[in-house]
Regions:
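Glycine-rich, flexible loop/turn motifs
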Residues: 5-7, 42, 51
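Alpha-helix N-cap/helix-initiation sites
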Residues: 17, 39, 52-56
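Short, well-ordered coil↔helix boundary/capping segments
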Residues: 18-22, 33, 53
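Surface-exposed, Lys/Arg-rich phosphate-binding patches that contact polyanionic backbones
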Residues: 23-41, 45-48
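C-terminal structural segments of small proteins and small subunits
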Residues: 48-69
């Protein structure tokens, strides 16, 4: 996997920066397109359901779960 790429997203009215490998960003972009939502809306959905898990980890797990099923 490549080096981390940072993107800024707005979550619950707060700007936050999220660093993921390009492959995970590509997977999340595909998922957002499939679900007809913006990448910000998808990440907000992941954020709401992540519990205690760090957001970057939750995004990676979500992408892997969606890829597998």
């Amino acid at each position: 996997m490549g080096s981390l790429k940072k993107r800024s997203v707005n979550l619950a009215g707060h700007a936050t920066s999220l660093a993921l490998e390009p492959e995970f960003w590509a997977a999340l972009d595909r998922i957002a397109k499939q679900d007809a939502v913006s990448i910000a809306a998808l990440i907000q959905r992941i954020d709401v359901g992540r519990g205690e898990r760090p957001l970057a980890s939750a995004c990676r797990v979500y992408a892997l779960q969606r890829a597998g099923g």
